[in-house]
Amino acid sequence: MSQQTTIRKLAELVNTPVEKLLEQLAGAGMKFSGPDQVVTSSEKVKLLGFLRRSHGKPEQAPEETDQSAKKITLNRRKQQEVTVNSGRSKTTVNVEVRQKRTYVKDGARAMTPDEERADILRKLEESRARNLAEQQALAEKDRLRDEAIVRAREEEVAAKERAEAEKKAAEEAAAAAKAAEALAASKPKVRAPIDETAPRPPRAPAAAPAAPRGAPPPPPRSDDRNNRSAPRNERGPGDRFAGQMHLSAADRARRGNSNNSNNRGRPGGRNQSGGRRDMSRGGNNAGPHAFERPTAPVVREVAIGETITVADLAQKLALKGGEVVKALFKMGVMATITQSIDHDTAALVTEELGHKAIRANDNDAEDALLASAGENQGEAVQRPPVVTIMGHVDHGKTSLLDYIRRTKVATGEAGGITQHIGAYHVDTPKGVISFLDTPGHAAFTSMRARGAKLTDIVVLVVAADDGVMPQTKEAIQHARSAGVPLIVAINKIDKSGADPMRVKNELLSEQVVAEDFGGDIQMVEISAKTGLGIDDLLDAVSVQAELLELKAVDEGRANGVVIESSLDKGRGPVATVLVQQGRLKKGDYLVCGIQYGRVRALFDETGKQPEFAGPSIPVQVLGLSGVPEAGDDFVVVDDERLAKDVAQQRETKRRESRLVATAGSRMEDIMATLGKGEGQQVLNLVIKADVQGSVQALSQALVALSNEDIRINVIHSGVGGITESDANSAAASKATVIGFNVRADASARRIIESNGVDLRYFSIIYDVIDQVKQVASGLLGVEIREEIIGIAEVRDVFRSSKLGAVAGSMVIEGVVKRNKPIRVLRDSVVIFEGELESLRRFKENVEEVRNGTECGIAVKAYNDVKPGDQIECFERIEVPRTL
């Protein structure tokens, strides 16, 4: 190292801060005034010895010092920039290259490479450890400095607040004292002398009568004005702070607030000592203001149920309703302040406004119901199987059940088809079996799906002469989706065109493989008319039921599913239910969807009244508050109150969900109307049917007829006869009333006749769909179509002083008529559309010219006809539009 090394340069070489190097030099006994002073070699040696002593190492011998003086180490640093490609952009990185070289004078012993490497590693490790310790010390020093700064700021703020509180308390105390003095000065000063030695009479327990409104307040006691040493509870309001002069202003303010705790916020009146309080509002409040402005945005956790109104959401967010409505408009949701919105929309707008939304559990009554239903635990016993008969329409499902039950249900059904689910239980030689008969018509898809979910075994009836049909394939899919085993009954084998093998091959294409073909599906050939093979079918059902090991709890509260429901004029709401667990008895309280009630009576399919219904037994229940939806679950509860609470809660949720959905669809209709310029044609319907399943099937089938030109809208549907309210709603909305196996009462007929409402009665679902199609087609109007009736080719063009350009033409196709519109085509491109001015043949006006005939054609208001053009004659016709 040269003799001209400065302290700053030395600090860079040894990688030490300049301040620390100055401290080390001062510790070694060398005083330097600045980092630019020169450090000699002897001073460096002295510093090295000091550092070695401070680290507990012996100083170097003179010969070692001489050897170290003969060796010099140079450190070189070079900085450069490197460009790095990172994806689509480029990043510039600063890179520092450090080089270190050691030079030894001649005569000094050169270190071996291993010794040099070890020495370098040792020095690097020591330097790294030293730097780490220094960095930790600096970080700790910075942390302590920051904490001291924060603490000083907090103390300063606290002192300032304390000073402000003391100042405010002092001002309020002075104001209170001044008010008390003014009050005392305004009262009469002459009083009768009071004998202090006489004993005071005891205070009466009863309150003194109130002074009249206009009377002046009683004068203060002279001893209260003069005696400053009296107890605090005997002093008047003027000397309230007299005994607190030695306290701080904050303590006086605190004590003043505690003394006013019994004032109850009313100006005037009496305090605890019987004196008058200050009449001004807040006159005795010596404490600081209670409100503090928040320093950060307040984030609230808002509990939101399935639906919530905009007003309730705004109240929970502590915002104005208009702000929430504005946020909804920005999100594309048009809602009013009283409108209900769903949970997802409410959660999105809550997050948009900077708060957190959590899902609220508003199913307290539902949870209590589930808890009570879960208490039904007992020993499971074997139960009868539930078998659903499915298949295509007119394949013999009901006839099969008629033979098993020895009844004639099929002959009494309208149109010879089943239009609702029938539930029966039959005592067979193989045991009790419960049967569900489902409709086969395409409109009753939901009924078939519901029957597949309730059943244990599906019997698929396929006609041997008809084969696999669309509803047959649909029944197979329902059975697969429900995970129910399948048994195929090939019916009508007694007919001449029966081919059971063809049926099996067609079922094979639907992945239904018979046992004869190596599969696992039992297929039985039967005849529902003669009874052939019925016993084999019952045997197959019994074997399948034994394999399933069907069990259920036969005691305790009952629960199950509604199969069908209707409204009987004499008996009220009637629900056909299938018990799945427990025992249903007369007098039980049950909840069924949004309906509830007490079981007044039970009826089986024969009309008898059983004492109870166990698992897998279908019965009719009377006593519900309304007609339940087909497919709803029912459960027996302890009391009517719980049943009513659960039903009302479900009804409220369903109504709110319906309102939310209606609002959304109404807004979509408005936007669609604005987009098209004119809205769709709408056909409003009011549907009333005898059973709930028929209502569902009709609603789904008729709404499915809607397209982009017309929309079928079911404004109301229900079970039972057509009532006065149904007629009024139909008249108000100009709807067509459809009665399916029901009739209108006298009052409804009067309204229908007076308002001209379209009323139609049906008993077969085919007729309903066909009639609605016709009515909807009438609303569509007609469509204008253009039909080309003739084409003439221009051969030459003549000029006429009266008509202008006349095209000598040959009719090459169809007929050209005089009073029909025409188009002029050139190179198969329409260049003009208008009408004929003249049509002549041999200089005579004619009405039409047929194929293969020459004629002269003058086009009105067009003279640019050229040879080779084609004149196309067409007519416009009206075609009725259909669905």
UniProtKB/Swiss-Prot annotation:
Any single GO CC term annotated in Swiss-Prot or TrEMBL for this entry: cytosol
UniProt region (G2), positions on chain: 416-420
Domain of life: Bacteria
Biased composition (Low complexity): 172-185, 256-265
Region: Disordered, residue numbers: 53-90, 171-294
G1: annotated span: 391-398
Annotated tr-type G domain residues: 382-551
Compartment(s): Cytoplasm
Region (G4): 491-494
Residues the record lists as binding GTP: 391-398, 437-441, 491-494
Keyword terms of this UniProt record: Cytoplasm, GTP-binding, Initiation factor, Nucleotide-binding, Protein biosynthesis
Protein name as catalogued: Translation initiation factor IF-2
Source organism of this protein record: Stenotrophomonas maltophilia (strain R551-3)
Highest classification ranks of the organism: Bacteria, Pseudomonadati, Pseudomonadota, Gammaproteobacteria, Lysobacterales
Gene: infB
